[in-house]
């Protein structure tokens, strides 16, 4: 059922009246992140999906210098965009890879539909259509956070097109609902997302992503997310975010890790404590979820051809926290592991 924008106006007016929930902090960006500068040129892929015309923003960055003829596709996380891969794009390009970094539907520079049936299968299909249009038949996937769940689904759906699979602190290494996390409805998620602020994002990420640490360079990414959430498209941004959270919570990939056939790399910051719904979970449930120091080892045993690289003391985004150390480990594995041809 299409979203009726007027339905949400009372909530928006209420939000505007509560300065503790929404305040004029930082920049505002358009509904497709207009006004935010990406590290490379953003192109747009137009396609039809679920009876509507949509577009995906993406970066297509050629190898610098001598190319190795291979392509890496980057899949961003829930609170991230293609732009947050900036240091990874540079490192991979300098190493001879062509790099494709799309923004998925509902995110960042891509369409925010009024109605969309979000599934990881659908997002994988959209991405595969983009790669086909770009003439890419095989690629290595690198997924971060929610992008790890999407990369897993893509690898299961199109195994013949995936040479290698690498995941950076993917969420979905456990099934939160099976472990007792309560269900939050789409409407409840939407109400929560309408109240997003830069300070709220910063506090959450400092605690959950970075183990209490913060670097000034992270503020750019907070402003990106918060600026989109409070900009002129905030109603549709929040609604799509709510639908995406429901997809993440209800569509686990955990039970299918055993079916992955390609070489797989898990890059895990061990101090990460991310778990969807943790904020509303009972204390006894909260205590047992989101332990990446344990989850990485457990899931590595489930994936047939896996390699685990841990970054002790790092959090949810080691590629942003310590780029040099992260990319050294990533490139070493990519270069020594024979891709599926």
Feature-to-residue mapping (PLM):
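Conserved serine/cysteine hydrolase catalytic core
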Residues: 230-301
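Catalytic active-site module of serine/aspartate enzymes centered on a nucleophile-bearing elbow/loop
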Residues: 293-341
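Conserved alpha/beta-hydrolase catalytic His-Asp/Glu region
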Residues: 196-258
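N-terminal cap/lid segment of alpha/beta-hydrolase-fold proteins
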Residues: 31-63
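Glycine-rich "HGGG/HGxG" loop immediately N-terminal to the catalytic nucleophile
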Residues: 43, 83, 104-120, 176
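Conserved acidic catalytic loop of the alpha/beta-hydrolase fold
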Residues: 121-139
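Conserved HGGG/HGGXW glycine-rich cap/lid loop of the alpha/beta-hydrolase fold
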Residues: 50, 54, 59-109, 329
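Flexible "cap/lid" loop of the alpha/beta hydrolase fold
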Residues: 152, 156, 165-196
């Amino acid at each position: 059922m299409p979203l009726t924008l007027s339905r949400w106006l009372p909530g928006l007016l209420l939000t505007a009246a509560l300065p503790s929930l929404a305040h004029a902090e930082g920049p505002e960006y358009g509904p497709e992140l207009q006004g935010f500068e990406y590290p490379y040129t953003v192109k747009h892929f137009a396609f039809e999906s679920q009876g509507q015309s949509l577009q995906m923003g993406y970066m297509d960055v050629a190898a610098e210098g001598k190319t190795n003829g291979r392509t890496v596709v980057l899949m961003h996380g829930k609170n991230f965009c293609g732009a947050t891969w900036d240091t990874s794009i540079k490192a991979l390009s300098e190493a001879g890879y062509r790099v494709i970094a799309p923004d998925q539907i509902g995110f960042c520079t891509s369409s925010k539909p009024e109605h969309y049936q979000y599934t990881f299968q659908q997002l994988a299909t959209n991405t595969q259509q983009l790669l086909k249009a770009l003439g890419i038949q095989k690629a290595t996937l690198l997924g971060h956070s929610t992008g790890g769940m999407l990369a897993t689904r893509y690898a299961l759906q199109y195994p013949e097109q995936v040479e290698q699979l690498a995941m950076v602190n993917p969420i979905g290494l456990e099934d939160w609902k099976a472990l007792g996390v309560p269900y939050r409805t789409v409407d409840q998620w939407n109400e929560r997302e309408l109240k997003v602020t830069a300070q709220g994002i910063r506090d959450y990420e400092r605690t959950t992503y970075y183990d209490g640490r913060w670097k000034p360079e992270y503020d750019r990414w907070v402003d990106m997310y918060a600026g989109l959430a409070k900009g002129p498209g905030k109603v549709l941004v929040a609604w799509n975010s709510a639908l995406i959270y429901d997809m993440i919570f209800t569509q686990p990939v955990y039970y299918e890790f055993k079916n992955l056939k390609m070489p797989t790399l898990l890059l895990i910051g061990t101090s990460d404590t991310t778990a969807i719904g943790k904020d509303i979970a009972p204390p006894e449930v909260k205590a047992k979820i989101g332990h990446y120091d344990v989850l990485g080892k457990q899931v590595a045993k489930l994936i047939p051809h896996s390699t685990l690289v841990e970054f002790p003391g790092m959090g949810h985004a080691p590629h942003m926290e310590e780029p040099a150390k992260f990319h050294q480990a990533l490139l070493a594995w990519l270069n020594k592991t024979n891709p599926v041809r």
